[in-house]
Amino acid sequence: MRKKKAVSDAIYIASYNPKNRTVPDERLDQIFSDVGRRYGYDDVKAKFEPFPDFKIMWERSYKWAEFRVSDYLDRAPDGVLIQLAESVFERISGKQQDYGEALFRYFEDVRDQNTPDYLQRKRLNPESIGRYHDLNDCVNRLREQGLIPPDLECILCWDASSSRKVSQCSVIQRVLTVNSRLDMQGVPEYVLDYAVYNKIAHLMSGYGRRSADAEATRLDALYPMRIEALSWISDHGMTL
């Protein structure tokens, strides 16, 4: 039986406008140049880019480096950007450097502001109800099993892209997507629930720290029908 639509979730309209920036490219470039000199780089360039996800890309040689920084940071205070630049240059130097707490606090403070842009760039509609399944039902079953806390919050979406992954998430934006190929009749509940739980494990583990992946793996192993779900996923040509 086809799942009926209930009252839909809010639909976000992207509000990003580069004129709203409080940090121009010139200031970002200056911060990265100043930090870079402390690490032996005398020619450093940096600018913001509208990446769908938070990320930093760079090219470098002996004395020069060029950075493209997610524009989700184009309203960040100098302290956050300086700490970010220091962490990146530490990583370039070969050290296993975690991003600083200031960056994580900033993302938490501006999460709601960045959500419309994130959803638009990823081409996502923040609605949990699909044709046959409601992702909120998965969350409720996981709560009933005691696998996730009752106060955990995230945005649930169906992903209509061509990805073979059963689910994906942005830990920073707390957005969890499930492949629309699972929104079909006959898909076992334990598979749907595992697709959601596997990514909720990452949301519960946090971000930016090397220990986060290990904690997500530990939580993932607690799912009662994990082996059966993985077998079904593999048999249907999909991956985690």
Model feature map: region roles:
Residues 196:
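A conserved beta-strand element that flanks and buttresses the S-adenosyl-L-methionine
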Residues 199:
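Walker B catalytic acidic pair
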